[in-house]
């Protein structure tokens, strides 16, 4: 495509054919019509001519500088005068930001402005943009001239790309003007489309054809300099670039046309909205000020003929009217302030008033938009802590507190604005009001614990396994453990049953094993769950002569929930009734399959009494431990779990701690739940004082501030201040959560109990030696409650019975249960004086049975009918003023005067009532036995007939039991 016609080249450059022919003639190329062909040499001659005509002269450029003032009024820094023009050139970034701000803040043109004013405003804006572009071009020309002095050959040699892209540079707008037009295309479309991007490759001093030097007559064209012929590859590349440039121009023209149409529609809609707003404002103004004509808002209001107007008042009204039209105080602002509030729309006129220093005529910037409040609802993401007040919740959702209270009342909660609600209720309220509720992250001191755990890294070493012995009551768990320990623990337990979690560690030839002995009674479910939580391996003890029992099934469930492996010890195989195969079958039904049957559970037949296969059981436990590869860091702060806790009168709070990792030392600062303190003493399970304990070793510790809850995690902290802070925070958090839930529960109970008779309540105060015992006892007693009699555990705690417990019993009418504890002398004396009953127990069965008997005594007795005799009516005697008298024969039993009677006719009960009189002959008698005749009357009933039978019975009360 080396030869093209003049018409094609003109179409490619988007220039008229006549202008291109004229420039070709000036360059020395003789072409007469648009159909003449153009060669590459012709194009290069034209390029050389235009470069010389519009390019640099090689000398210095002098720029006349005039001093003037620039007024800045929240827009582009430009002031136009009649004779001279001074331009303050911002940077490209500032220019783009200012143009964007001017477009977004411009107020729409008032409807009464003519089309000529709008065109004049657009022309003025285009002139300002052109002036900025020319100034930038002059600065760039000066800079390029300096660079040209240093390297003239490079400046004078035009690039080959300019030959096709810049033949008409004298009439081409600078690139900066194109950028300004593109930025203003949304609000102020340009008359000319943007030039191709290839023109931006030209130096600024070559593109600027509208500078001061361009006004001078052009010099005659220099003779053409012969240029080397380009290769075919370069020509193909140029053709491809030209094609892309043409496609880009077409795309830009389409975009510009679309923007112009969109702008026209927007202008029409704005004008229509302005007219409607203006009409509404004029109607409103007409109602407020009838003395002012609505047709001429600029003129002063004339006086009404039938009503005199005060001159001062009229003057003030006139000034207000001028202010409404933007010609009052706002028009005379000094120093560019333009009045008190230029940025706010006044009386619905969305115009921005611009003032000048000398109070010149106003300039109204069109397309300025006033602020509009958001109409769409705002959805907040609300983080809800454990407890939150109603006021804080409303603040987080940015709504009024009344709305939150209203929503809670709809849910049935009568709350005040300062009342606390729990997290679950708050999340429901947040969702109800259309926001997104999420539980808040732990923004509390406990986050310090996680950071500290990550910071400490120590080498993990092998540790002993923790083995929990579980099973049904009386299946021989503790006896099995006794044989392993060679001790007699069962004899020390009351009733021969375990009522505490015992923690022991045993040294075997193959290593150390830590055992946890859990109670098998159903009341100690929580203890068994804690034992399974802290364990590595579970030994499930099943009696060979008893089989699978309820607590055996529960122990299997705990082990599966904790995800720990099991070893089944089939105990009591030395008994005659032992049947180990039946045990295997029953356990298989509960998904505990022996390994010899293809399962993964080891079954060992043992006898705790004779010591059979005990070594095989330990071997199986250690084999499971090897498979688990149990490790824990040793040289690190200790972490563990509270297995049991109690309050000792002489030593204070005593807790049994199973160390799970690290080394616990005497004097460490320990945090366990809401309790903390420095360890003052440590003893092992044999009562021997020790100074440190490693992983998987159980110890008793002294020195905590309070009795911790069994099952709490414990860890050593380096700072007592931090431990105190975390413990106090937990206490407050638990208290708030508990109170919030109690309040909700009270309201629920109030509605549930509405309309029901009040049930009797048996109040109990429980004091036990360890926490696990009073937990089990309180849970068992609450299970005894019925609809008629309820057990109310007012208080339960660890330690001996004190005077405060007795005083609480006096105030509430409760009795006190002491489980393995006693009352001191002062408490006993106070209880005797106030008739407070204190009962001591050391076996949980006895306590449950006595409470059950007391509850049975509180039940209302049951009424039963007891038949005493049968009577046959043989004659009916009617006596006036008395009624019908039945002459009867007692056929069975005895008839008493105060008995109840049931009238039976044809084996159908006709009436049930009482006897009013009983006589034998004429004498009143108390009773008549079988075989004797008597006369009787039924109270309030006379419809008796011969042949009827009377069944006499008494109502007796029978005591009920639970």
UniProtKB/Swiss-Prot annotation:
Annotated NCBIfam families: IF-2 (TIGR00487), small_GTP (TIGR00231)
The keyword Magnesium is assigned to this record: no
Region (G1): 471-478
GO (cellular component) term, any one: cytosol
UniProt region (G3), positions on chain: 517-520
UniProt region (G2), positions on chain: 496-500
Family: Belongs to the TRAFAC class translation factor GTPase superfamily. Classic translation factor GTPase family. IF-2 subfamily.
TM region(s), chain numbering: none
Alphabetized GO MF terms: GTP binding; GTPase activity; translation initiation factor activity
Protein residues bound to GTP: 471-478, 517-521, 571-574
Stretches for region Disordered: 101-366
Encoding gene per record: infB
Xref: HAMAP family: IF_2_B
Function, as annotated: One of the essential components for the initiation of protein synthesis. Protects formylmethionyl-tRNA from spontaneous hydrolysis and promotes its binding to the 30S ribosomal subunits. Also involved in the hydrolysis of GTP during the formation of the 70S ribosomal complex.
Main location as per UniProt: cytoplasm
Domain tr-type G, residue spans: 462-631
Record field: compositional bias (Low complexity): 145-157, 219-234, 270-283
Stored PANTHER family: TR-TYPE G DOMAIN-CONTAINING PROTEIN, TRANSLATION INITIATION FACTOR IF-2-RELATED
Record field: compositional bias (Basic and acidic residues): 117-141, 173-216, 235-269, 338-354
UniProt KW keywords: Cytoplasm, GTP-binding, Initiation factor, Nucleotide-binding, Protein biosynthesis
Name used for this protein in its record: Translation initiation factor IF-2
One Pfam family recorded for the sequence: IF-2
UniProt subcellular location: Cytoplasm
Region (G4): 571-574
């Amino acid at each position: 495509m080396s030869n093209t016609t003049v018409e094609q080249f003109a179409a490619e450059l988007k220039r008229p054919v006549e202008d291109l022919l004229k420039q070709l003639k000036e360059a020395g190329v003789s072409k007469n019509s648009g159909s003449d062909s153009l060669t590459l040499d012709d194009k290069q001659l034209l390029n050389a001519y235009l470069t010389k005509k519009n390019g640099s002269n090689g000398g210095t450029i002098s720029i006349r500088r005039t001093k003037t003032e620039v007024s800045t009024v929240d827009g582009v820094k430009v002031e136009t005068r009649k004779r001279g023009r001074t331009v303050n050139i911002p940077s490209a970034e500032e220019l783009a930001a200012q143009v964007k701000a001017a477009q977004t803040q411009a107020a729409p043109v008032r409807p009464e402005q003519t089309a000529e004013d709008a065109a004049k405003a657009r022309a003025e804006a285009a002139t300002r943009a052109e002036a900025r572009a020319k100034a930038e071009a002059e600065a760039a020309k000066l800079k390029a001239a300096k660079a040209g002095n240093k390297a003239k050959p490079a400046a004078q040699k035009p690039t080959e790309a300019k030959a096709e892209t810049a033949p008409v540079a004298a009439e081409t707008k600078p690139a900066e003007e194109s950028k300004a037009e593109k930025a203003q295309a949304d609000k102020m479309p340009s008359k000319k489309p943007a030039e191709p991007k290839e023109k931006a490759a030209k130096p600024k001093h070559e593109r600027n054809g509208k500078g001061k030097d361009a006004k001078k007559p052009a010099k005659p064209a220099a003779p053409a300099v012969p240029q080397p012929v380009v290769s075919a590859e370069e020509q193909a590349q140029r053709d491809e670039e030209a094609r892309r440039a043409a496609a880009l121009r077409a795309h830009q023209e389409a975009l510009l046309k679309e923007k112009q149409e969109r702008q026209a529609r927007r202008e029409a809609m704005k004008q229509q909205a302005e007219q409607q707003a203006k009409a509404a404002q004029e109607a409103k103004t007409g109602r407020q000020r009838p003395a002012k004509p609505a047709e001429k808002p600029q003129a002063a209001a004339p006086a009404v003929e039938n009503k005199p107007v005060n001159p001062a008042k009229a003057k003030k009204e006139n000034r207000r009217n001028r202010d409404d039209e933007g010609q009052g105080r706002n028009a005379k602002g000094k120093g560019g302030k333009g009045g008190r509030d230029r940025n706010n729309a006044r009386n619905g006129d969305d115009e921005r008033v611009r003032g000048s220093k000398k109070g010149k005529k106003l300039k109204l910037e069109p397309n300025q938009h006033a602020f509009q409040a958001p109409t769409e609802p705002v959805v907040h993401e609300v983080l809800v802590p454990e407890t939150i007040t109603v006021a804080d919740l409303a603040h987080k959702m940015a709504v009024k507190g009344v709305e939150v209270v209203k929503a809670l009342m709809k849910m049935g909660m009568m709350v005040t604005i300062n009342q606390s609600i729990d997290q679950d209720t708050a999340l429901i309220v947040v969702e109800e009001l259309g926001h997104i509720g999420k539980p808040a992250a732990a923004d509390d001191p406990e986050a310090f614990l996680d950071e500290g755990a990550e910071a400490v890294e120590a080498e993990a070493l092998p540790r002993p396994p923790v083995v929990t012995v579980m099973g049904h009551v009386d299946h021989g768990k503790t006896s099995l453990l006794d044989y392993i320990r060679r001790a007699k623990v069962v004899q020390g337990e009351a009733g021969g049953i375990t009522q505490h979690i015992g923690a022991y560690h045993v040294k075997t030839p193959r290593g150390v094993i830590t055992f946890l002995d859990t109670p098998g009674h159903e009341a100690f479910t929580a203890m068994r769950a804690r034992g399974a939580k802290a364990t590595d391996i579970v030994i499930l003890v099943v009696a060979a002569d008893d089989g699978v029992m309820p607590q055996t099934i529960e122990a299997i469930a705990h082990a599966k929930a904790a995800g720990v492996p099991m070893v089944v010890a089939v105990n009591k195989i030395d008994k005659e009734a032992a049947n180990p195969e039946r045990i295997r079958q029953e356990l298989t039904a509960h998904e505990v399959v022996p390994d010899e049957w293809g399962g993964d559970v080891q079954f060992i037949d043992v006898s705790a009494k004779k010591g059979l296969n005990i070594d095989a059981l330990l071997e199986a436990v250690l084999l499971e431990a090897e498979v688990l590869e149990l490790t824990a860091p040793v040289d690190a702060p200790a972490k563990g779990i509270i297995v049991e806790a109690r309050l000792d009168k002489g030593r204070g709070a005593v807790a049994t701690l199973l160390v799970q990792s690290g080394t616990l030392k005497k004097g460490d600062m320990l945090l366990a739940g809401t309790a903390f303190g420095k360890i003052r003493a440590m003893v092992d399970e044999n009562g021997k004082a020790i100074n440190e304990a490693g992983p998987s070793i159980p110890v008793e510790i002294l020195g905590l501030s309070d009795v911790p809850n069994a099952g709490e995690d414990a860890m050593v902290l380096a700072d007592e201040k931090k431990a105190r802070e975390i413990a106090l925070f937990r206490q407050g958090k638990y208290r708030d959560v508990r109170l919030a839930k109690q309040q909700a529960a009270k309201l629920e109970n109030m509605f549930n109990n509405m309309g029901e008779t009040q049930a009797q309540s048996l109040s109990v105060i429980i004091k036990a030696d360890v926490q696990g015992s009073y937990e089990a006892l309180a849970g068992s007693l609450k299970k005894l409650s019925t609809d008629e009699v309820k057990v109310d555990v007012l208080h339960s705690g660890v330690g001996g019975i004190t005077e405060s417990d007795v005083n609480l019993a006096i105030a509430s009418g409760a009795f006190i249960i002491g489980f393995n504890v006693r009352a001191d002398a002062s408490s006993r004396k106070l209880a005797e004086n106030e008739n407070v009953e204190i009962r001591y127990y050391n076996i949980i069965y006895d306590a449950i049975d006595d409470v059950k008997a007391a509850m049975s005594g509180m039940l209302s007795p049951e009424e039963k009918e007891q038949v005493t005799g049968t009577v046959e009516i043989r004659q009916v005697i009617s006596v006036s003023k008395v009624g019908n008298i039945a002459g009867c024969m007692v056929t069975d039993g005895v008839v008493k005067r105060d008995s109840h009677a049931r009238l039976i006719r044809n084996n159908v009960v006709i009436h049930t009532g009482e006897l009013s009189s009983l006589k034998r002959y004429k004498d009143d008698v108390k009773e008549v036995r079988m075989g004797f005749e008597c006369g009787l009357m039924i109270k309030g009933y006379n419809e008796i007939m011969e042949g009827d039978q009377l069944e006499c019975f008494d109502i007796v009360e029978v005591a009920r039991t639970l």
